[in-house]
């Protein structure tokens, strides 16, 4: 249940009755200060200005036509024309009880869509590195969230599984097989790629064979396709190990690599020529876009086919957009890649639309993200300046979490301790990233992310475990608890109840904008509000049984909300810490 949406609809209806245009916006927002209510409608002044009316007089007209008696206990006009909304405690109790009994905490599926989410996208025959982390975990959090909201989500792992380098890789794989190299040697993909490149650069006979294999692979030669498939499978098996460690939902079934779109490319280029969009320039085929200018102020040229007949990433991305609309029947396609890809994606999609391959109703969204930086403010590297392998980063996270947990005086079994170490180690890396606005760069800092204070995974995981411990101290039957009446009298109870009912607002924002940090911020605020409630309002030692049960209901919904929210982020919780 989305309070903001409900209030927006009702206030807009009243604004229209009072004379505003149908396109008006109530601009309902959560209030920053209690004295200004729980929500504020800030759109009155703009509507009044259009009508040539006094804003406060128009605000009164809106109130006269506003039906909010069940939701709000008080409405007031403030300042030049804001409407402050104070929610009704009786309504809050009803909605809290409804959320507790609903499997999705009161969130109903509406306007179901098919959404393709393109994320992770590592390259074949190369190991995943830290540069793949953001796309993988941000994309996965959004995929989980959209599924939770009732949408049909199609995960598309757009792996780099095609290109001229595959002739070189197939030739080297063949050489290894002929020399009876063990399978283990293939497990070090970086070394495999490096050796293949070395042979290509230094051995002309090898290089010629590699070039021949490129031609054969592209023409569908069975032997080359088999060798190529083996390279893809070996790579994706290793990637799957990283995905499993990261608690990411991607599987081999989600692989939709560049090769998938290969058969489409010649006909797309031919069609772009027929439509007059692509023209020849120095042997290459180029689409000139008036919407983008080069340094001389002329329309920018985007190459869709090289002089040698080869296709480019732009051509593949045009085909991918077309495929996702025509074949996958998607309503939206979200691509999670770094900000440096923004112009490339916008150009590919502009050509896609100009060619009529997708309608305006099909939403193509580049969810760009910034870089992970070291403490020196430069791109995150190893001490020697090399690229950090993702597996090495996760290993270090586990090592640091092990030291952290061993320092704590815990009464956990070895299995319980290991579960906590895994949850905190991997969770810390993920949460540190997810809690930052994806469009900005952020500094990777082990000390901050492993802290039990602040907006971190350990703090959030501990907040959940702390609430679980309350229920471990009571033998109250869950059915009896759900049936018990809920009363909201204390201000701390009221604040907690409202924050709990704002869960859907945060989740809907993540689904719409692709911004998991909004959910992180919500969960952190919720944990802080619960902590204040817990200190101020005794639960197990409440003055009577009815207050105890009522507060336990608030605690139970907080526990469920924290767990569900962290699950959407792909962060594991533990029952004991």
Swiss-Prot record:
Gene Ontology CC entries for this record: cytoplasm
Keyword terms, alphabetized: Aminoacyl-tRNA synthetase, ATP-binding, Cytoplasm, Ligase, Nucleotide-binding, Protein biosynthesis
UniProt keyword annotation of Ligase present: yes
Enzyme class: ligase
InterPro entries: aa-tRNA-synth_I_CS (IPR001412), Arg-tRNA-ligase (IPR001278), Arg-tRNA-synth_N (IPR005148), Arg-tRNA-synth_N_sf (IPR036695), ArgRS_core (IPR035684), DALR_anticod-bd (IPR008909), Rossmann-like_a/b/a_fold (IPR014729), tRNAsynth_Ia_anticodon-bd (IPR009080)
Motif ('HIGH' region): 122-132
PROSITE patterns on file: AA_TRNA_LIGASE_I (PS00178)
Known catalytic reactions: tRNA(Arg) + L-arginine + ATP = L-arginyl-tRNA(Arg) + AMP + diphosphate
Domain of life: Bacteria
Subcellular location: Cytoplasm
GO molecular function: arginine-tRNA ligase activity; ATP binding
Documented EC number(s): 6.1.1.19
CDD domains referenced in this protein's UniProt entry, alphabetically: Anticodon_Ia_Arg (cd07956), ArgRS_core (cd00671)
A GO biological-process term: arginyl-tRNA aminoacylation
Main localization category: cytoplasm
PANTHER family: ARGININE--TRNA LIGASE, CYTOPLASMIC (PTHR11956:SF5), ARGINYL-TRNA SYNTHETASE (PTHR11956)
Self-association state and partner proteins as the record states: Monomer.
Family recorded in the similarity comment: Belongs to the class-I aminoacyl-tRNA synthetase family.
Protein name in the entry: Arginine--tRNA ligase
Organism: Haemophilus influenzae (strain 86-028NP)
Gene it is expressed from: argS
């Amino acid at each position: 249940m989305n309070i903001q949406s409900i209030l927006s609809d009702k206030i807009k209806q009243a604004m229209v009755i009072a004379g505003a245009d149908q396109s008006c916006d109530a601009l309902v927002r959560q209030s920053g200060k209690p004295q200004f209510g729980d929500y504020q409608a800030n759109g009155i002044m703009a509507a009044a200005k259009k009508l040539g009316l006094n804003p406060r007089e128009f605000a009164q007209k809106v109130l006269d036509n506003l039906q909010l008696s069940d939701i709000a206990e008080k409405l007031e006009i403030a300042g030049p024309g804001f409407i402050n909304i104070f929610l009704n405690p009786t309504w809050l109790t009803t909605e809290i009880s409804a959320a507790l009994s609903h499997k999705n905490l009161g969130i109903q599926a509406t306007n179901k869509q098919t959404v393709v989410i393109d994320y992770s996208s590592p390259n074949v025959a190369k190991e995943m590195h830290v540069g793949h982390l953001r796309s993988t975990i941000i994309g996965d959090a959004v995929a989980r969230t959209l599924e939770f909201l009732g949408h049909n989500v199609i995960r598309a792992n757009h792996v780099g599984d095609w290109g001229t380098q595959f002739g070189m890789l197939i030739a080297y794989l063949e050489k290894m097989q002929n020399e009876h190299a063990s399978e283990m040697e293939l497990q070090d993909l970086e070394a495999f790629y490096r050796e293949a490149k070395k042979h290509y650069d230094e051995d002309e006979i090898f290089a010629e064979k590699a070039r021949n294999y490129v031609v054969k692979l592209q023409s569908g030669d069975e032997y080359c396709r088999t060798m190529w498939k083996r390279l893809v499978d070996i790579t994706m098996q290793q990637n799957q190990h990283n995905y499993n460690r990261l608690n990411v939902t991607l599987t081999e079934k989600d692989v939709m690599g560049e090769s998938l779109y290969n058969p489409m490319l010649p006909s797309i280029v031919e069609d772009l020529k027929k439509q007059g969009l692509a023209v020849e320039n120095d042997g290459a085929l180029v689409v000139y876009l008036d919407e983008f200018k080069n340094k001389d102020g002329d329309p920018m040229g985007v190459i869709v086919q090289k002089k040698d007949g080869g296709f480019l990433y732009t051509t593949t991305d045009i085909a991918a957009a077309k495929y996702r609309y025509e074949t996958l029947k998607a309503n939206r396609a979200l691509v999670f890649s770094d900000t440096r890809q923004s112009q490339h994606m916008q150009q590919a999609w502009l050509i896609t639309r100009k060619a009529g391959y997708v309608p305006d109703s099909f939403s193509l969204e580049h969810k760009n993200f910034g870089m992970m930086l070291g403490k020196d403010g430069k791109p995150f590297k190893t001490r020697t300046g090399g690229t950090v392998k993702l597996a090495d980063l996760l290993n270090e996270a586990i090592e640091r979490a092990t030291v952290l947990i061993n320092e704590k005086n815990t009464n956990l079994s070895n299995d319980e301790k290991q579960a906590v170490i895994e949850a905190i180690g991997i969770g810390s890396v993920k949460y540190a990233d997810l809690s930052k606005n994806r469009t900005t760069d952020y500094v990777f800092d082990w000390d901050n992310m492993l802290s039990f204070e602040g907006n971190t995974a350990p703090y959030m995981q501990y907040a959940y475990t702390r609430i679980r411990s309350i229920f471990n101290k009571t033998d109250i039957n869950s059915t009896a608890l759900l049936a018990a009446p809920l009363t909201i009298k204390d201000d701390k109870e009221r604040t907690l109840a409202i924050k709990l009912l704002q869960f859907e607002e945060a989740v809907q924002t993540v689904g719409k904008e692709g911004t998991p940090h909004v959910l992180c911020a919500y969960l952190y605020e919720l944990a802080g509000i619960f902590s204040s409630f817990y200190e101020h309002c005794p639960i197990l030692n409440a003055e009577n049984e009815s207050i105890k049960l009522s507060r336990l209901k608030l605690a139970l919904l907080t526990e469920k909300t924290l767990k569900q929210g962290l699950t959407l982020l792909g962060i594991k919780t533990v029952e004991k810490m």
